[in-house]
Amino acid sequence: NLRSDELTKENIIQRLRSFAQKAFRRAPVAGELEPVQKLVSQKINDGMAPLEALKLGFQSILCSPGFLYLNLGEGELNEYALASRLSYFLWSSPPDDTLLNLARIGSLRAGLSSQVKRMLSDSRSDRFVRHFVRSWLDLDNIGSMPPSQDFLVYYRDNLESAMRDETETFFRHVLDNNLPPREFLDANYSFLNRELALHYGIQGVEGNKLRRVSLSGSSRGGLLGHGAFLTASANGVDTSPVVRGIYVLEKILGYTPPPPPPDVPAVEPDIRNATTI
């Protein structure tokens, strides 16, 4: 709703600086906006409407390295770099006004704990949960290794997304309630919907929405019993304790075992019942 007749020279400069701070995720350094301001002034002098010239200035800012590249510098992060690191880590998006204002006055580092709590309570932190869990446990591999035809009858179309959602919701629950790390292994509950519960052989769960379900007396508790965990650590056809064991070592214990000695031959596949074309 902004009109050209409302834009004075001072107002244009102020709007450019405000826009640049959000685009660059920091305050513009001395002289950084001079080329943009000169461009806008030149276009206005050439007869372009101030509003159109301002839009051109915005476009120029969005084409600059300060916007296109996330350059946090070397060494200890300054306040603006800390705001960007925090925001992209927890929200996968640029810092909001609160973070930028705290960075501007130099108070972000002192209030870091309260800002982390604020950001984790925001729905945008669901992006962190999704990206972190999928990267940690390779959950994006689910679907690239479908089960063999013999088992497709047990593998419904929406199970893949439900499996991911179970693990992500479980991680979110542990995070929100500040539970100890052992909860990932010995929890006696999970978050299931009807399809996933039926796949696990659990009765009495209705609807598509995930809800907390007690698993007392079951071996399903914890990440090791999640369908997503078991699917991501398999190839969809064969059971391989070695492959799954390496997956557990790397993802849970943070240890990558060395390769087998060169004099240990590969295990030949069982082809006793195989046929040829």
Mark where each language-model region is.
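Active-site substrate-binding loop specific to GH73 endo-beta-N-acetylglucosaminidase modules
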Residues: 1-277
